[in-house]
Amino acid sequence: MEATAAPFSSIVSSRQNFSSSSSIRASSPASLFLSQKSIGNVNRKFKSPRSLSVRASSTSDSVVTLLDYGAGNVRSIRNALRHLGFSIKDVQTPGDILNADRLIFPGVGAFAPAMDVLNRTGMAEALCKYIENDRPFLGICLGLQLLFDSSEENGPVKGLGVIPGIVGRFDASAGIRVPHIGWNALQVGKDSEILDDVGNRHVYFVHSYRAIPSDENKDWISSTCNYGESFISSIRRGNVHAVQFHPEKSGEVGLSVLRRFLHPKLPATQKPMEGKASKLAKRVIACLDVRTNDKGDLVVTKGDQYDVREQSNENEVRNLGKPVDLAGQYYKDGADEISFLNITGFRDFPLGDLPMIQVLRQTSKNVFVPLTVGGGIRDFTDASGRYYSSLEVAAEYFRSGADKISIGSDAVSAAEEFIKSGVKTGKSSLEQISRVYGNQAVVVSIDPRRVYVNHPDDVPYKVIRVTNPGPNGEEYAWYQCTVSGGREGRPIGAFELAKAVEELGAGEILLNCIDCDGQGKGFDIDLVKLISDSVGIPVIASSGAGTPDHFSEVFEKTNASAALAAGIFHRKEVPIQSVKEHLQEERIEVRI
């Protein structure tokens, strides 16, 4: 059984700290922020291990100690560990770290608040001593970055100083999109141990900052990854491991990484898992539109130009299945990510009882790829009069299993205000969530409709020449953003919105098109090309997929990083695997 004691995250109340109005820099001790000159003088106490043997467990071989400092989605690693047959002991005191037989540190969120928590609670010193003694350790994502001297994120900010180097932001001038989101390949070195089964398979990354190989840290490196440049994707020295990617979100190959850490004496397989990964893959995302039907049941539905009701006398909500079951099937079918869109208000529920929260908790038990949830990420007051901020709503979604949250109407309001004033207030849900959890955790969903015009000067928005003329032969159009499920048009174009939300902290754009929704005639290539050419963050093409050819078309003709579909997968018209096989035949990199 899992230990019943409260996790460290609840003791330090870091979630409440993150919700405060003070900025990260203000909430962090001044000692965390270093000058570039002093960064190189960080004291490093790590000693080379005398033995590579695994320390025998003094309690139980089926218990893992987990350091959860209270930010982001840690439920997924918990579920992965349970899936592998392990129970979890949560860190409550520094002594729990020192007494751990094996320790996993799934760092999520931003560097500065994580170091703030570790320093305030004495965990930083305990972590360094644990690692110095060559005890079994696995850091994940931020759990790798914190081992370095410092980070430029919100800083410079001093790290644990175990590994030489500065964690810096990816260089977008190299022609890459930042954040680095998606499935990429590893270049595995010798003696990686926990990566022995990976081979040429993709693993899942989501980060904006990285550490670079150097002469000073080369002895730590067990694998690198290429994204505009070579960066450190994993380290290993003795029993100390850390990875930049998310094994708990990398499907079966990721579970094999965790399994090898937990069972270091497992015999090597005859050959690594088969695959042909060589670079960042294009993603195929399955979307589930979730709402209550007229009977009060939570169902997956699908719209026709955003209309989700059957065209019959009953006019009932289309019911295409139960969300948890469908998500599980999509995972088995090979979906690279699963996106839930909550299209019901649910405002009568207390936050912890929201139906979508329950869907996430159940889904994340057996689905080990990224989960995104959208709809309703805004301030609200429930039926009892309790007020919740958008940051609290997002925090609950993350703690329930979401890896990314998608903001729609609220982002439109924030963008309109930003364009009008030219000032970032820091008060919008987009800015607040991005500041606490990093922009890689925030997706902005854009719902535009095509508006034809006779001449580019007819409107004060970005106008393009379209491939298909309008009903009166118009050769030009702009894309008007909408809110309230497409029912209300706003005085802002998709181009203007995309540029604004990137400035405000969005890490990814989900680009829909009302005109193409449910039509099965392909994505709006003109729109996708316009937006993906205009921003430096990843763009997900959505609306209109009807055949595998539509996926290859959008990847070949635009700079979209991913393509999303709903209805064709729900109705089993096109299997996910068929889409991937087609993309592979077209020589488009995909995860198989």
Swiss-Prot record:
Residues 63-271 form the Glutamine amidotransferase type-1 domain. Residues 1-55 form a transit peptide. GO terms for molecular function: glutaminase activity; imidazoleglycerol-phosphate synthase activity; lyase activity. Pathway: Amino-acid biosynthesis; L-histidine biosynthesis; L-histidine from 5-phospho-alpha-D-ribose 1-diphosphate: step 5/9. The active site is at C141 (for gatase activity), H246 (for gatase activity), E248 (for gatase activity), D289, D447. Residues 280-592 are annotated as: Cyclase. Keywords: Amino-acid biosynthesis, Chloroplast, Glutamine amidotransferase, Histidine biosynthesis, Hydrolase, Lyase, Multifunctional enzyme, Plastid, Transit peptide. Signal peptide: none annotated. It is found in: Plastid, Chloroplast. InterPro entries: Aldolase_TIM, Class_I_gatase-like, GATASE, His_biosynth, HisF, IGPS_HisA/HisF, IGPS_HisHF, Imidazole-glycPsynth_HisH. Its EC number is 4.3.2.10, 3.5.1.2. It comes from the Eukaryota. IGPS catalyzes the conversion of PRFAR and glutamine to IGP, AICAR and glutamate. The glutaminase domain produces the ammonia necessary for the cyclase domain to produce IGP and AICAR from PRFAR. The ammonia is channeled to the active site of the cyclase domain. In the C-terminal section; belongs to the HisA/HisF family. HAMAP family: HisH (MF_00278). This is Imidazole glycerol phosphate synthase hisHF, chloroplastic.
